[in-house]
Amino acid sequence: YVKETGVDCLAVAVGTSHGVYKGTPYLDFDLLKTLANEVSIPLVLHGGSGTGDENLTKAVRYGIQKINLNTDLNKAGQSALKEALNTLEKSEGKKLNLQQTIAFGIEGWKEELVHYMKLFGSAGRW
């Protein structure tokens, strides 16, 4: 498939899917290792959110070079936003404007992203 299509990267089906999981998914690391040994292009893991840090770091060790984590990032941003709104409204009794509100969500999103960058060893790299 890789030779026929000339793709730049390959999203592999090794046990993850998009969206929210009930429980932690089972990743087929034997299949992932085989695929990584067979192709010379970067492997992609779709649906990395909810997979767990241990599974994700192992997936990187076994050849995954790009991981989609949108659900985890969005959940972190939403959680930070909700916490900030509850705390500020209770302690100061005031409402925030939209720009202030969005900033809290972005900060939560960034904190989660930094967590993953450190987890995968990509923090501080260019």
Region annotations inferred by a language model:
Residues 28, 74, 78, 98, ...:
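Generic structural signal for well-ordered, non-membrane alpha-helical segments
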Residues 37-46:
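Short beta-strand/loop segments at the ligand-binding rim of alpha/beta enzyme cores
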Residues 21-24, 45-48, 70, 105:
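Glycine- and other small-residue-rich loops at beta-strand/loop junctions that grip anionic moieties
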Residues 1-38, 53-62, 67-69, 82-83, ...:
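Alpha/beta enzyme core
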Residues 15-17, 48, 72-74:
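Short, ordered loop/turn segments at secondary-structure junctions
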Residues 18, 42, 64, 92-99:
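A near-ubiquitous, low-amplitude feature marking generic local secondary-structure context
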Residues 90-103, 122-126:
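Flexible, glycine/charged-enriched surface loops at secondary-structure junctions
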